[in-house]
Regions:
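Helix-rich catalytic cores of soluble enzyme domains
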Residues: 124-212
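Residues that line or immediately flank small-molecule/substrate-binding pockets and catalytic motifs
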Residues: 74, 143, 224
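Hydrophobic residues within beta-strands of alpha/beta enzymes
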Residues: 70, 139, 178-179, 220, ...
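Short, histidine-centered active-site or binding-site loop motifs used for metal coordination
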Residues: 104, 145, 184, 226-228
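Conserved, mostly hydrophobic/aromatic
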Residues: 46, 141, 180, 222, ...
């Protein structure tokens, strides 16, 4: 009975997250990653500056028109806005569902040079219970798969999807929707076909493992990479080629009963990420059995971060850019994005 109740809660949460053409905002950068981005923008790397930046995001007027849920980091969910409101409560007030990143990062996999395994399962049941009391209704765990001459190995793929499945089981037990993120990195000189082959292998291995762990596929969200050539590849593919390869790979690998796919941007420029998502939804609308949306971080945040620069006087302009960027991605989810939207900034 309790399992059935949880299943309904999970379905309802997913429905709300993606209602009215919305997507997800990933603002779950670890302290190290956030500091790196601050350093590049010339912003002091302090806990207070990180708090101010996160407040800038969660208090952006009208953000809930395009964003149904925001993924927080442990530091963020414990922080308050200037008026003393917890960040998660500020999101709820803005009409956005709070989520939480629960993995503790990818570490070098012993015995497998250049490959990583994501950690964070120890004590996860207790952490999920705490995050739930703090308002989190969904969670995220990211696995990292690297393409190189001799990678990925089947050992690293299996280890990572095993961890993703254990995480998903603990989330569903807690009534929290798991975002399952197996990211095949864009880094490298590989072709789009190589990315396709690796992504297909990863997804098929993942869903077999999720099946073995009795994961309720209707109560999860898949956050995959798009099928795209490596950043150093000699061949650059067209927007339509990326859309076609991505859709074909997903149709081959992802069960139709999964309710939603929310793409990661993976370091693509904001414009490219939107154009690819748009082509997927526009060109293949009649063939997609899932909601196909976004869960972008840099592809939404970067323009705002570049303008903010840590200055109070730039907050309104930065929020305007954040709002516009999210609007563009929501349009791409509907297959209605065009580059002219970028000029309206």
């Amino acid at each position: 009975m309790e399992k059935q109740m949880n299943q309904q809660i999970l379905k309802d949460t997913i429905k709300q997250l993606f209602a009215n053409g919305k997507g997800l905002l990933a603002m779950d950068e670890s302290t190290g990653t956030c500091n790196k981005r601050f350093a590049a923008a010339g912003i002091p790397q302090t806990i207070e500056m990180r708090r101010k930046y996160r407040e800038l995001i969660v208090t952006t007027p009208g953000l809930n028109e395009s964003i149904g849920g925001a993924i927080l980091y442990d530091e963020t969910i414990r922080q308050l806005t200037a008026d003393g409101t917890p960040m998660a409560a500020a999101l709820v007030k803005a009409g956005i569902i709070p989520g939480i990143k629960v993995d503790t990062g990818a570490r070098q996999m012993a015995g497998f040079s250049g490959e990583k395994i994501t950690e964070g399962l120890d004590g996860l049941r207790e952490r999920l219970a705490e995050y739930k009391t703090m308002g989190a209704r969904f969670a995220k765990w990211r696995a990292v798969i690297t393409i190189a001459a001799n990678t990925p190995t089947i050992a690293s793929i299996k280890a990572n999807v095993h961890a993703l499945s254990r995480y998903a089981a603990l989330c569903q037990e807690a009534g929290i929707v798991p975002i399952v993120e197996p990211e095949v990195l864009m880094t490298g000189d590989h072709t789009i076909q190589r990315c396709y082959d690796v992504t297909e292998l990863v997804l098929k291995t993942l869903f077999y493992q999720l099946y073995q762990f009795d994961i309720d596929l209707e109560g999860m969200i898949l956050k995959p990479n798009m099928v795209i050539a490596g950043t150093e590849s000699a061949t650059k593919n067209t927007v339509d080629e990326v859309a076609e390869a991505t859709v074909k790979c997903l149709l081959t690998s992802v069960p139709a009963i999964v309710p939603a796919i929310a793409f990661l941007s993976g370091g693509q420029s904001p414009e490219n990420a939107a154009a690819h998502l748009n082509a997927i939804n526009k060109n293949f609308k009649d063939r997609l059995p899932w909601i196909v949306s976004f869960s972008f971080a840099r592809a939404i945040q970067q323009p705002a971060l570049d303008v903010w620069k840590g200055e109070e006087t730039n907050v309104a302009q930065a929020q305007k850019l954040l709002y516009t960027r999210a609007k563009s991605d929501a349009a791409a989810r509907r297959g209605e994005y065009n580059t002219a939207m970028e000029q309206k900034k």
